[in-house]
Amino acid sequence: MITDQNSKPQQGELPTTHIDALTNSFSQFLRIEATSGAVLLLATVVALTLSNSPWSDGFRSLWETPIGIQIGAFQFLRSLRDLINDGLMTLFFFIVALEIKREVVLGELRNPRMVAFSVVAAAGGMLVPMGLYLALQHGQPGQHGWGVVMPTDTAFVIGCLALLGSRVPPGLRVFLLSLAVVDDLAAILVVAVGYSRSIDWTALALGAVGLVIIRGMALLGVRNIRVYFLAGAIIWLAVNASGIHATIVGVILGLMTPTAGWVSDQRLGEILRKVLSYPPGDHWSGDTEDNRALQVAGIAVRETLSPVERLEAMLHPWVAFGVMPLFALANAGVSITIKGLINPVSLAVMAGFVLGKPIGVTAFAWLGVRTGVAIRPAGLTWGGLVGGALLTGIGFTMALFIAGQAFQDATLNAAKLGILAASVVSSVAGLTLLCMFPKRDQTLDADFH
């Protein structure tokens, strides 16, 4: 390693190297949540461009490429698209579950009435669009796609808020994140229950046994994350064979992840004081007492963080900048035609997102506050909430995912067009309204009271 001799880190900081100038900037880039929305948008544009170009047939065929393994009588063969949708997306759902667990135990969702505000608003944002969709598609071939209009895309919503900067009303970001988390959890359950095949109970029982084993390993104090990932992969195979959509495994494992660190802050302090008690010098190598103490300190520092925090920090960049763009490339490609846009399924999807979402979120949130069931977050005006409610019409990722489970061929193409069109309209409408209203809109607040 080449160290920058001219660089003098401040006391308590790590020494710097020449490569840090590049890697630190890149790490900061990955930490910006809004950036993932921009990358996702870029992948979507690429998919749409290639799907409507002379290379469209080759682009679509790429995602149907069969990939798998065979060991004796065991054979696992899936298309590249299925591996992304069923396999890699499990990591996405795992991250979503980690966020849910963290928010409920450590974050904004600890306050029951604050939780109620997000849950009630999310319920309206799911029930009203679903009801509107079913009203338009009752008795039609697209009726089975009622789950498409339920979710909200967190990355795109946060990306939109980032464009507004300081104009975003206080509390709106937390509210939309909480609402999106509830939306995603409900959408995951819809996929698992509403869009699964006939169930193989033996395979499902094997998956349940695997979950019990993972719980047992946690109680015994097994700390190696690789062991849990291996066990999770085996459970995924069992649940996938059962007929239930295997992405539910990611949710269950995420919710099972502990939120407390193994090493307490007090114990960490004691271990570090022991390391610091040794005299300075080049004596930290070899099988010596001070070297062993240093290794223990390294483990203690890592284990002070909870598994939820460690896994989220480790996996989030891979999911945001790897899994999600791949998902968009594999699923957002759609042939843009006037016939597809005026298809009844496309129109029903657009109505559900563009009209149903904001109406449902706003109306249910208002009812929750009026009945005393929930409290509105401090600093969140009703004008800001309406603008945010319009942004919840950006369904994209989860909507495309559910559409892939509910539809095939031409109907799927129409549903994708509806999702994309609704996402564009909702983002423009939401951003416009949030720009029009100041942070504190007393007039609209008074009207709602």
Curated annotation (Swiss-Prot):
<dbReference type="GO" id="GO:0015385">
    <property type="term" value="F:sodium:proton antiporter activity"/>
</dbReference>
<keyword id="KW-0739">Sodium transport</keyword>
<keyword id="KW-0813">Transport</keyword>
<feature type="transmembrane region" description="Helical">
    <location>
        <begin position="233"/>
        <end position="253"/>
    </location>
</feature>
<feature type="transmembrane region" description="Helical">
    <location>
        <begin position="318"/>
        <end position="338"/>
    </location>
</feature>
<keyword id="KW-0050">Antiport</keyword>
<keyword id="KW-0915">Sodium</keyword>
<keyword id="KW-1003">Cell membrane</keyword>
<keyword id="KW-0997">Cell inner membrane</keyword>
<feature type="transmembrane region" description="Helical">
    <location>
        <begin position="174"/>
        <end position="194"/>
    </location>
</feature>
<dbReference type="InterPro" id="IPR004670">
    <property type="entry name" value="NhaA"/>
</dbReference>
<keyword id="KW-0472">Membrane</keyword>
<dbReference type="GO" id="GO:0005886">
    <property type="term" value="C:plasma membrane"/>
</dbReference>
<feature type="transmembrane region" description="Helical">
    <location>
        <begin position="347"/>
        <end position="367"/>
    </location>
</feature>
<feature type="transmembrane region" description="Helical">
    <location>
        <begin position="87"/>
        <end position="107"/>
    </location>
</feature>
<feature type="transmembrane region" description="Helical">
    <location>
        <begin position="202"/>
        <end position="222"/>
    </location>
</feature>
<feature type="transmembrane region" description="Helical">
    <location>
        <begin position="382"/>
        <end position="402"/>
    </location>
</feature>
<feature type="transmembrane region" description="Helical">
    <location>
        <begin position="417"/>
        <end position="437"/>
    </location>
</feature>
<keyword id="KW-0614">Plasmid</keyword>
<keyword id="KW-0812">Transmembrane</keyword>
<comment type="function">
    <text>Na(+)/H(+) antiporter that extrudes sodium in exchange for external protons.</text>
</comment>
<feature type="transmembrane region" description="Helical">
    <location>
        <begin position="114"/>
        <end position="134"/>
    </location>
</feature>
<feature type="transmembrane region" description="Helical">
    <location>
        <begin position="32"/>
        <end position="52"/>
    </location>
</feature>
<dbReference type="InterPro" id="IPR023171">
    <property type="entry name" value="Na/H_antiporter_dom_sf"/>
</dbReference>
<keyword id="KW-1133">Transmembrane helix</keyword>
<dbReference type="GO" id="GO:0006885">
    <property type="term" value="P:regulation of pH"/>
</dbReference>
<feature type="transmembrane region" description="Helical">
    <location>
        <begin position="145"/>
        <end position="165"/>
    </location>
</feature>
<comment type="similarity">
    <text>Belongs to the NhaA Na(+)/H(+) (TC 2.A.33) antiporter family.</text>
</comment>
<dbReference type="Pfam" id="PF06965">
    <property type="entry name" value="Na_H_antiport_1"/>
</dbReference>
<keyword id="KW-0406">Ion transport</keyword>
<protein>
    <recommendedName>
        <fullName>Na(+)/H(+) antiporter NhaA 1</fullName>
    </recommendedName>
</protein>
